Amino acid sequence: MELIVLLAVVVAILTMAAARLHYQENITDFLPADEEYRESMELYEQLNEASRIVIIFEGASPDSLCEAVDLFTEQAVASGLNEGRLTSEVDVSAFVERLRFVHAHAPLFLTDSDYQRMDTLFTPEGFRKALAKDKQLLSMPGSGILRDILSSDPLRMFPLSAGASGQYAAASAAFTSHDGYMMTADKTQAFAFYDSPYGSTESRRNAALIDSLQTIVNQTKESFEGMNIRLLGSPVIAVENARRIKRDSLMAIGASIVLITLLLLYSFPHKRDIALIAFSVGFGWLCGMAMLTICVGEVSVIVLGIGSVIIGLAVNYPLHLLVHQRYTTTVRQTLKEVLSPLLIGNITTVGAFLALLPIQATAMRDLGIFAAAMLLGTILFCVIFLPHMMSAKKTPLREIHLPKMSGSFANGLRSNSIRIQHALAALVVLLSLGFGVVLFVNRNESRFDSNLSHLNYMTAQQRTDFMRFEALNSATEGHAGDLFLASSAKEELARRIALWNNWWQGKDRNQLLADFRAAAQEEGFRPDVFTPFEESITKTYTTDVPLDKCFPGKLDIGTLNSRIATNLSDNFDYLGLVCSLIVFVFLCLSFRSLRLAVIAFVPMAVSWLWILGIMQMIGIQFNIVNIILATFLFGQGDDYTIFVLEGALHEQRTGEPMLPQFRQSILLSALIMLITLGVLLMARHPAMHSLGAVTLIGMSCVVFMAWVLPPLLLRITTTNKHKNQKI
């Protein structure tokens, strides 16, 4: 009675703590969390307008498109949307302002290659060619923006200026203005824009905003027959991703519950056993949620979705106890025989998940906290409470039989036949060598996919719209994001100013300016047109510029992506190394025998060789989502290996058959895991689908190695001395 009261009190406390946990949806929590990276990502979103929602109007005539844009704008304002964030024209003011800042601080943005170009630009012939081109560009209709650009940089020293002028004709061919509305050149599409105040990653808040916009879209479409209006942009795609993840998760959870329930009902005739498994895992889940509340207070729902994978690990503990009970006479005997492998497996698995804590990614740390607390809570329930709930009456367990793929092969997996085991060992060695060769040949290829766009889900229509709009938009975009590097470090600013001053050494600025003015006069320009340019040439520059406020960090998108790739790849390598060390050290401490620790560790090492080799051969890569399975597979692999090794040791010491029941519980556990994650192969979201694919490969390799290698390695390495050794 006291134990029931204690359990009720603990559950009540855990439930109250878990209820205080807050949730949010931000997939960037899986990315590095250092301040420099955060600033870079914020800057990237600003420069690339990642929070902008594009409203695409597609109709029969330009006039109907204009009317549709007007009606949409009126309804949007009437519904309470911020009018200042809605526009139907291209906003060039920010672009021009950015250019003016760059031109006013010229040396801070020039690169070594720019100085090589300047050697040919700052000559009488270079002046004449550049100004003749400027005159040609300024004679084009609607060239007002170019006047601002070329008055500050007539020689187009900066690639941004060169791109803006050189792409002007291409932009005219891609877009046109009709009564002040932005349209494609063929006037079949018009565009309006709305800047989300929530950025591109806050999918929960953006979902409400996009629902409001979609309602206005539907109302507008009803007023125009044949009008097609669609939403596009990073916030739209992020919301669609979040919704797709939820739909896929519900599908996977529903299918998993049905299939696992059928499997457990088949294996455990008494519903009481299934309830005990559910109670054990539920207690562990509450422990994980409560620990998240205490440690962080807020968690991504994506973390909890992936955290459901941990159920497959936690279910091992009550499952092993209940399965093994069928082969013993008392609950006490069951605990005596199973407690050691349960605790060893739990400690090594918890240690592997704690390896996630030092990673500089919020979601990874949260997952480590949740998984470690859940597994500890589950094992505590199984050791303290579950034995008192288990029935002393033994009920038969229906065995799960291996499929009849090949009689001798299946029998070999079940039996301890030395001949069959040696044949399987030879197969393992040959395939391991083959996979090793594959990995060596492709050693320079990355096994980590850091391209986040590969994890985005888009409908076919969204993908088509996105590709078309990007193709059109590329004609009008400058390349600030690709070509300029702004650094807040005084040393870098000083170095660039020194480059500028060194380039001018030995050159007569007054003479060069006189040559420039003469060339401008020949082309018919007024003397005061290029005053901003002349001032930038004669100005004295210092490092006392608040450059970090205008460009706080790196604008080089290639460098930013490279940093992401390097950081994530380092995380992957770190996980592999640390998990291996943690598992091996705990195995040594638990078995107190280097030989047994090596026997338990080798199957996991070979499993990873197989996993990486198979993934390399069929073209599957790890990414920021399925990398978490690296820790999970280590945890599951060492659990299975330890149980099989403990069973083999028990048979060696006592002569009593123990492997069959251990293998039976492992097979049942593996089937549950394959069901839990294997159903994700049906998911349409790329990230969740990749979880299913990696799980199918990883679990198959882990179970096969745990099944085959430990008994064989134990038999090979056992001498008379070892037979008498107490473990």
Q: Where are each of the predicted segments found?
A:
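Signature of alpha-helical transmembrane segments and their immediate interfacial
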Residues: 1-25, 388, 396-450
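Alpha-helical transmembrane helix bundles of large polytopic membrane transport and channel proteins
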Residues: 67-182, 186-189, 488-537
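Extracytoplasmic
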Residues: 140-266, 270, 521-584
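Interfacial segments of transmembrane alpha-helices in multi-pass membrane proteins
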Residues: 247-299, 362, 576-618, 682-683
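Hydrophobic transmembrane alpha-helices and their membrane-interface caps
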Residues: 274-320, 596-644, 705-709, 715
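Pore- and gate-forming transmembrane helices of large, multi-pass membrane proteins
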Residues: 278, 328-359, 601, 653-684, ...
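Transmembrane alpha-helices and their membrane-interface boundaries in multi-pass membrane transporters
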Residues: 294-295, 307-326, 339, 343-358, ...
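Juxtamembrane segments of multi-pass membrane proteins
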Residues: 417-522
